[in-house]
Amino acid sequence: ALRQTIHPLNAAPLLTLINEQEKTLMKDLEKKHLADCREDFMRRRNTRDRRDVAECRKRLDAFLELWPDSAERETVAKVRDFLNVIQGGVKGKLSVVKGKINKETTYDKPDVFVTVSQGNKELLHTKMIKDNWYPEFNEGVDITWTVDMPPLTFKAIDVDPVMDDELFTHHEESLGFDGYKGLSKTITDTGCELFIEFKPNTPIPDCPWLK
């Protein structure tokens, strides 16, 4: 109605001003929408609830639909694609690669094996490596990582004729949007080290908001 009133007066400068104000308003709304999406993502990133992944993804889908010409479209799409991949869980192989035994924890070179368990369920029991401070295992188990996956327990056991010695115990809680990264690192306990590695069956796309 305002445009129809102005047009007969040939008030081109005023129409230009209105157009510029509309563009500014829309940019501000887009900026606020993006900020809300990012804030929601950061608030949920350490979640242990898969529903948080779905809620974040829905928000980003709505942003991409509402602002198809956004300068941030590519970034938002990458975040959305990342959430799509992790929402249902990521299948891959969790491996116990190698270890380093603290010489102060045992009298002589240990005969050591490693177990990986989840609650009361043993997922992996490696072969025993004899007489070695630096055992190499290179054994793994297929798992599905999810944001709500229960903690994993890693133990290194020194086999002894009288009584086995527990040299190492580590509980790994791989929660949150990027919790899978916690399954590829060197874990430590009592001066001992164990290198573990998680290799997804399909690549997980980079997430710009987690860098």
Features from the language model and the residues they span:
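Short solvent-exposed coil/turn linkers within tandem alpha-helical repeat scaffolds
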Residues: 2-25, 50, 61-79, 131, ...
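C2/C2-like lipid-binding beta-sandwich modules
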Residues: 81-113, 202-211
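Alpha-helical linker/edge segments of TPR/alpha-solenoid repeat scaffolds
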Residues: 21-43, 80-91
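Compositionally biased low-complexity segments at domain edges in trafficked proteins
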Residues: 184-211
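Peripheral membrane lipid-binding modules
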Residues: 103-191
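Short coil/turn connectors between adjacent alpha-helices in alpha-solenoid helical repeat scaffolds
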Residues: 43-52
